């Protein structure tokens, strides 16, 4: 759900706005829980629920901006994540079952997954392991013969040029469109919970990475573009 990546002040802001619209025991409790929380405390279940809902709303905002209908957006809520702490539970059969279910329902021709193994608190790695385990279980299904899996990099490191198997050129307008979509994830900008060693904003890192990839292709004698998104194919 991404709930632990939402800062307390962001959750408090939402709870106070909701409470000001009409008294609610739930939001009153959330405001109290956040106010009484110490640096050694974990979030209460109500606070975690609010933070997870905030992340969902931000994602829906971004996908709407990109023109994706709400009924085509699915949230997995993998159980391994829901500990309320940075340390997660081990990946379990229930996580794989959820991943299997969404793939079997949609029967996708392409799957795009974050290959950010440099993610400071490892969530992307675990999600990727869940996908790989699911692919291993489903690979003999007839519909999987037409499915390709592409891995991209996010806010951290880009693929090396010799690893890239698909590069998608981007115009200046597309770069700006991607930036605006990232901005919908309001709680993940302006000093986030898990920044890593790079202090640049996530959207700045993403743009710099895309522009640098385009420059590398230009130096190889290929066409010049504003930016390029790079992918590596995962064979299963």
Annotate each language-model stretch with its function.
Residues 1-145, 183-184, 198-205, 212-219, ...:
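Active-site beta-strand->loop->alpha-helix modules in alpha/beta enzyme cores, enriched
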């Amino acid at each position: 759900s991404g709930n632990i990546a939402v800062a307390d002040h962001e959750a408090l802001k939402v709870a106070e706005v909701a409470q000001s619209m009409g008294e609610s025991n739930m939001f009153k409790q959330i405001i109290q829980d956040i106010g009484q929380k110490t640096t050694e405390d974990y979030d209460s279940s109500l606070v975690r629920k609010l933070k997870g809902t905030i992340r969902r709303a931000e994602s829906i905002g971004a996908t709407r901006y990109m023109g994706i209908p709400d009924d085509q957006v699915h949230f997995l809520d993998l159980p391994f994540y829901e500990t309320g702490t940075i340390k997660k539970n081990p990946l379990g059969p229930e996580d794989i079952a959820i991943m299997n279910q969404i793939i079997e329902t949609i029967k996708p021709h392409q799957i795009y997954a974050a290959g950010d193994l440099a993610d400071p608190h490892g969530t992307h790695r675990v999600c990727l392991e869940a996908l790989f385990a699911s692919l291993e279980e489903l690979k003999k299904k007839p519909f999987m013969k037409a499915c390709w899996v592409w891995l991209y990099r996010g806010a951290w490191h880009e693929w090396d040029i010799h690893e890239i198997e698909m590069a998608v050129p981007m115009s200046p307008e597309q770069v700006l469109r991607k930036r605006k979509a990232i901005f919908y994830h309001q709680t993940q900008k302006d000093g986030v919970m898990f920044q890593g060693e790079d202090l640049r904003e996530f959207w700045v890192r993403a743009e710099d990475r895309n522009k640098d990839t385009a420059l590398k292709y230009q130096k190889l004698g290929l066409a010049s573009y504003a930016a390029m998104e790079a992918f590596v194919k995962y064979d299963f």
